[in-house]
Amino acid sequence: MLFTHRNPEMELDHKRTALVLVDMQNEFFEEKTGTYYELIADSLKERNVISHTEQLLKTAQELGYYILHSPHWYYPTDLQWVVPGGAIAHYLGGIGFCGRKDPVDLEGFAHSRADYYEPFKKYLMDGRTCNTSPHKHFGTMANDMVKQLRMRKVEKVIMAGPASNICLESHMRDLIEAGFEVAMVRDAVAGPKNEEGDGYVAAMVNWRFMANGLWTTEEAVNKMKAAATAA
């Protein structure tokens, strides 16, 4: 039996909706070897993810939507971990993924792999966007994303990010469990591949079952504009 059921369309409320982004960092978007970018380079280009992500950021900023961003950072003290990670965690630990010197000392941070992607800084560092504490493995359990959303009385989120089937999906699942309505933007995300298949396709299959909405960037932008006009 093929699952074809459709839930009622998710309706946006300007005051209760936020754009939630995950991993807006050089590690994922900057064209460098030896970084996560290599795993998703083709997927980023195929779906024009960088341009679509900026469209979402620009729209949310101009229309006054809350923007929340969950970065991925590791500090030298995280090397004290002795619990083994899975395949992707083990791999990333070996390539210096999203490494920072210290939570407070910013020496060496600017323009590093862990820094925000330069074209997005005008949105992420505008003084209004909330950059949460970092997530450590995949989801929100180690950061304050849910707290930040709750304190703004946000009920609905529009989500995007480069690691569709890993960090982004983990955030999505956590927010659904926490009681938020969630719409995923299908062409503002990327995914890596392994011998089992395509991570992007795996994410789309799961999101079709779980998310309240699965939209293109154009659809998301139009819905955000309509809700802002109606407010």
Functional labels for PLM-detected ranges:
Residues 75-79:
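Short catalytic/ligand-binding loop motif for oxyanion handling, primarily in non-cytosolic enzymes
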Residues 70-73, 162:
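Short, well-ordered beta-to-alpha junction loops that form the rim of enzyme active sites
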Residues 22-23:
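N-terminal nucleotide-binding beta1-loop-alpha1 segment
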Residues 15-17, 32-60, 64-71:
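A short alpha/beta connector and helix-capping loop motif
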Residues 1-18, 27-28, 55, 59-63, ...:
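Active-site-adjacent betaalpha module
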